[in-house]
């Protein structure tokens, strides 16, 4: 056979015949990207794995997001049958199985796959690393009754076995993450600091160190220094990738009593996300503006927060506070009356009304407002009553 012929149709049937060279069929093969080939999908015939292990692994990666876990396991079984000495197949099957696991029997299969991966692996450290991550992610799911001896401590043991073979920064980063999860913050920080001296240092690794220091109650300036190292890894104009870190540094600057600098970060965040912010953002930026004595900006931000979340009484109370702060007591009373129209039992509104009325030299009305706040259970009004109404 050297070609497959097909009779022509139409006007050229008398003079033309079409044929496909036999070599064309011989050249057909399954590649790493064949899983997404619509022609092959439409045929409905089960696809073979690509001819090389490397291509087959890419094929599995492509398939993992397009098929059910059950179908994916069938592909993994095929891969393991074809490449029984590849640790990757066992590691991937263990990872797939753990998310479907419902009992100790199915977890036993996960462990068996990881043990087999270790026995065939050329790079033992890679398997220890993957086993540590598997246990760590399993524990993050807060299982009611963890499987056998699985724990954060066991995950630490596994990652340290990997580090003993080869101290890769990514292994040290994982050790830090596990130690952080088990709330051993001092040890986690030591890992993160080591990673931050390596070639994989990034905004994320400096952020991890900053959050760890924060939980250790370190001075605000030390936390801020790490957040500066985090943000400096981005260039202006900032994109959405930098946005979460700008938000975190804004809070770090607030904690370090740098309100004006915090406002700059909030403004940079706003630009980075193209103005797609919510009411909470405006509340936080208002807090920075208020602390920086930028009262008009504080008023504007609280009005915007209320516009986005009109039923949130906390925002109305905050707007009243800013108005009182700048002597706009009539405006504060109007804001608080609007809050009481939403919830007539909002005690804080009455307390703030009393404060505004005191500023307006209306002591009798203020004391009536304080009394109403106390009646509704405001815990902060007793001192005001004691000072002004007795």
PLM regions: where:
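Register position in tetratricopeptide repeats
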Residues: 99, 137-138, 181, 215-216, ...
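Residue-level recognition of tetratricopeptide repeat
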Residues: 86, 124, 168-169, 202, ...
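Canonical tetratricopeptide repeat
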Residues: 92, 130, 174, 208, ...
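C-terminal cap/linker of serine protease catalytic domains
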Residues: 2-63
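TPR alpha-solenoid repeat register
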Residues: 89, 127, 171-172, 205, ...
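Structural marker of alpha-solenoid helical repeat scaffolds
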Residues: 82, 120, 164-165, 198, ...
